[in-house]
Amino acid sequence: MNSITEVKNKDFAMPEKAFLKYADTVYRLAFVRTKNKSDSDDILQEVFLRYIKVWQKMESEEHVKAMLLRITVNCSNSLKTSSWFKKTEGLNENLISSEELGGFSLLDEVMKLPIKYRTAVHLHYYCGYSVNEIADTLKINPSTVKTHLIRARAMLKNTIKADDL
């Protein structure tokens, strides 16, 4: 009887609900980190497979979200360092870029940033996380997150100015 009550109290953490609520966020973060749709799909699947193993230990909805993002970062890091990944050659999925179409895409410019800056920008501006939340998720110092955001903004500013000339 006690375990049934515990499951009802942890309704927010049920894998199906977590997937419906956070799958898009997890996928977008994976895509920002890998720049590849199929790798992002693999990471999304791996994240929720890992989550299914531990979902009953979640204490609050904030813990669910933080854990999913942390697993996403770890999975994307693992993918980049795997021997399989090192032996593969990626295809350019954007065969027609926005530059060829005569347009300017801020997302294209963000995707050109180094991964640490790209991740911080995505979590801060696209997901709406505070500096402290990003620091907790990435397990880095809040001042490091601020530095990443400042440098990313400077790089984007220079790119935009160069494109305007």
How would you describe each model-predicted region?
Residues 2-28, 41, 52:
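A short, charge-rich alpha-helical start-of-domain segment used by transcription regulators
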Residues 120-124:
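A short pre-motif secondary-structure segment
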Residues 8, 35, 46-63, 82-83:
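Sigma70-family region 2
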Residues 28, 42-49, 62-74:
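Structural recognition of an alpha-helix C-terminal capping motif at a helix-to-coil junction
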